[in-house]
């Protein structure tokens, strides 16, 4: 049944926009799954692309059945919104070669980065990502929003069901602190490694993630302000009408967001034309890979439970020559020396000195567990030696370097003959 709070000429464009945005996003996701040649990169891209369909469905539900959507659909959207911030951070980390490469190689060439906000800069020391503890601080700052969001959604439902406006105010204050801290930590990471990120043209990807979150957040505040001032909504339905109009506006915006996401995270760079000799996963295994949670569980455990036991100087130990050829007087280098790092062979090698009979800087065996990909761990079926990957030999050979050279040679000879 149509929602009576929206006129038909507003209601149906919102519904159709949600459907169109969902179709665009699922088309892009499907093409990724059919060309699944870089699992570690594409699983993150698909998880980010999935944000638009989730927003589209939840916003459409919000204008069709606002009461039910607030309780059953919105918490899913809220949690996934936070999850995408973490996924985007992981995506940037992957582009730069992983956490170890960032800490032990890339960040050694940078001076510590001052906080962009002067007041914070006077209180907190500059961020040096070559220090594992600083990297952990930034990563936890991003992840805490993901951990906080389920509690926030649960608390919001309790406040709505039991009519607790005062508790809801405090909950919103903590929510704003959490989301601000998360975005600020992501901005710090961005600022520290911007020269290394520039070749990957990250601005479009950054806008995809940030615009949809900012649009949802600030439009909600503006519309709520219009409701409070009496500019929007009448009678006892003020709060519901504000909720419906907010979701209706987001429905319209989902179409350009879907197009923007498809451009920022394209599937065509993973085709046989772009990677001629690269094998791809079958569709069903690609689907299983991006829906799997093994990488998330491992990363959450190492960050939340292991913490400094994993992110310490010994586990993230740069090469001796790299450490000496860069900023020798950096805080991270001096801290490594304090924790037992020593150089030998005129700085060509290094070793660690263990103080006392127990080396308390190493990771316990119960925590240091290697993560195994579910797909990589599958055994090979005798009837299919390429399981679970497929080689597109015909397509790959057609776009190989040798065929391209031959094609250019034929074209040049043809032009000379003419």
UniProtKB/Swiss-Prot annotation:
Effect on the protein of changing residue 373 to A: Moderately reduces the interaction with ATG8
Main location: membrane
Cytoplasmic side stretches: 27-43, 100-141, 190-205, 268-418
Region annotated ATG8-interacting region, chain positions: 379-402
Location(s), subcellular: Vacuole membrane
Gene Ontology MF annotations: transmembrane transporter activity
Alphabetical UniProt keywords: Membrane, Transmembrane, Transmembrane helix, Vacuole
Pfam families: Solute_trans_a (PF03619)
Outcome following mutation: residue 384 to A: Stronlgly reduces the interaction with ATG8. Impairs interaction with ATG8
GO process terms (BP): protein targeting to vacuolar membrane
Single GO cellular component term: endoplasmic reticulum
Positions in the Extracellular compartment: 1-5, 65-78, 163-168, 227-246
Parts of the chain that traverse the membrane: 6-26, 44-64, 79-99, 142-162, 169-189, 206-226, 247-267
Membrane association type: Multi-pass membrane protein
Role: Vacuole membrane protein that recruits ATG8 to facilitate the degradation of vacuolar integral membrane proteins during early-stationary vacuole turnover (EVT) when cells enter stationary phase.
Subunit structure: Interacts with ATG8.
Family: Belongs to the TMEM184 family.
Protein name listed in UniProt: Vacuole membrane protein HFL1
Gene (name only): HFL1
């Amino acid at each position: 049944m149509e929602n009576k709070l929206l006129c038909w000429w507003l209601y149906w464009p919102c519904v159709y926009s949600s459907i169109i945005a969902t179709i665009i996003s699922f088309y892009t996701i499907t093409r990724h799954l059919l060309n699944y040649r870089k699992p570690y990169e594409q699983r993150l891209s698909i998880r980010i692309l999935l944000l638009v369909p989730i927003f589209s469905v939840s916003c459409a539900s919000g204008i069709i059945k606002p009461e039910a959507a607030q309780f059953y659909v919105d918490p899913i959207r809220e949690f996934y919104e936070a999850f995408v911030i973490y996924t985007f951070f992981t995506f940037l980390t992957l582009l730069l070669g992983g956490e170890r490469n960032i800490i032990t190689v890339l960040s050694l060439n940078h001076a510590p980065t001052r906080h962009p906000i002067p007041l914070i800069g006077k209180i907190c020391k500059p961020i040096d990502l070559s220090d594992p503890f600083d990297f952990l601080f930034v990563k936890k700052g991003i992840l805490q929003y993901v951990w906080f969001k389920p509690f926030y959604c649960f608390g919001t439902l309790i406040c709505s069901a039991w009519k607790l406006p005062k508790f809801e105010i405090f909950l919103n204050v903590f929510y704003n602190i959490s989301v601000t801290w998360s975005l600020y930590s992501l901005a710090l990471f961005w600022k520290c490694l911007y020269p290394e990120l520039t070749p990957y043209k990250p601005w479009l990807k950054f806008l995809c993630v940030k615009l949809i979150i900012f649009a949802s957040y600030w439009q909600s505040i503006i519309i709520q302000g219009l409701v409070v001032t009496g500019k929007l909504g009448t009678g006892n339905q003020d709060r519901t009408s504000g909720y419906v109009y907010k979701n209706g506006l987001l429905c319209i915006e989902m179409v350009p967001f879907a197009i923007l996401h498809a451009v920022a995270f394209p599937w065509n760079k993973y085709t046989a034309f772009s990677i001629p000799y690269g094998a791809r996963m079958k569709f069903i295994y690609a689907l299983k890979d991006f829906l799997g949670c093994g990488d998330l569980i491992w990363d959450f455990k190492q960050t939340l439970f292991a913490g400094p036991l994993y992110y310490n100087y010994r586990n993230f130990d740069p090469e001796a020559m790299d450490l000496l050829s860069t900023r020798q007087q950096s805080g991270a280098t001096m801290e490594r020396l304090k924790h037992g790092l020593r150089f030998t062979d005129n700085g060509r090698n290094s070793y660690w000195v263990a103080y006392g009979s127990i080396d308390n800087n190493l990771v316990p065996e119960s925590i240091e567990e290697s993560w195994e990909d579910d797909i990589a761990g599958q055994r090979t079926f005798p009837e299919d030696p390429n399981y679970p990957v497929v080689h597109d030999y015909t397509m790959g050979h057609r776009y190989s370097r040798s065929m391209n050279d031959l094609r250019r040679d034929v074209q040049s000879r043809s032009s000379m003959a003419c």
